[in-house]
A protein has these predicted regions:
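A general structural detector for well-ordered alpha-helical segments in enzyme core domains, enriched
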Residues: 25-28, 53, 78, 82-86
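Glycine/Thr-rich beta-alpha phosphate-binding loop at enzyme active sites
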Residues: 1-38, 74
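A glycine-rich, aromatic-flanked flexible loop/lid motif
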Residues: 1-9, 52-61
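Glycine- and other small-residue-rich loops at beta-strand/loop junctions that grip anionic moieties
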Residues: 17-21, 43-47, 68-71
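Glycine-rich phosphate-binding active-site loops on the catalytic face of alpha/beta enzymes
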Residues: 48, 54-81
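Glycine-rich beta-to-alpha transition loops that act as phosphate-gripper elements at the mouths
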Residues: 38-52
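Alpha-helical structural signal in soluble globular domains
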Residues: 31, 35, 60, 81, ...
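Extended, intrinsically disordered, low-complexity segments
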Residues: 22, 84-129
Length: 129
């Protein structure tokens, strides 16, 4: 379990899913994608509940992104929400498709920070005059 996990159940045995896994799972994904070198499909998992989180997984090399806990917590509209957010994030990066984003930032921490920063400027609806 991540050392930073502050939940009262942090020491319990059993499964762990969702937000606590996002950063460590993205780091492992980046390493796997680096070793795979396009020879196999890599699936980004762990803590994805927003477009920026999915984008970070793609930036480190994910071919696919799995939704699990996020889908359970946010409901069946989550995939459509994430797709709309991904479109805005790609536009902010000057990209027209996800294939162009795949593997562009192989360092997990940098990819996470980039995706988060973009989400703060591009996903928030802009006020109209």
């Amino acid at each position: 379990r991540p050392a930073a996990l502050q939940n009262r159940y942090a020491g319990e045995a059993g499964g762990l899913s969702g937000a606590p896994l996002f950063a460590p799972a993205t780091d492992i994904l980046a390493r796997v994608a680096g070793h795979a070198k396009q020879r196999l499909a890599v699936i980004g998992v762990g803590g994805v509940a927003s477009g920026w989180q999915a984008y970070a997984k793609i930036l480190v090399g994910a071919d696919l992104v799995q939704l699990y806990t996020g889908l359970a917590l946010h409901g069946p509209q989550l995939p459509a929400t994430i797709l709309a957010q991904l479109a805005r994030l790609m536009q902010a990066d000057g990209l027209t498709n996800l294939a162009a984003a795949k593997g562009q930032i192989p360092d997990a921490e940098k990819a996470i920070q980039h995706a988060l920063r973009l989400s703060q400027i591009s996903v928030t609806p802009k006020a109209t005059a």
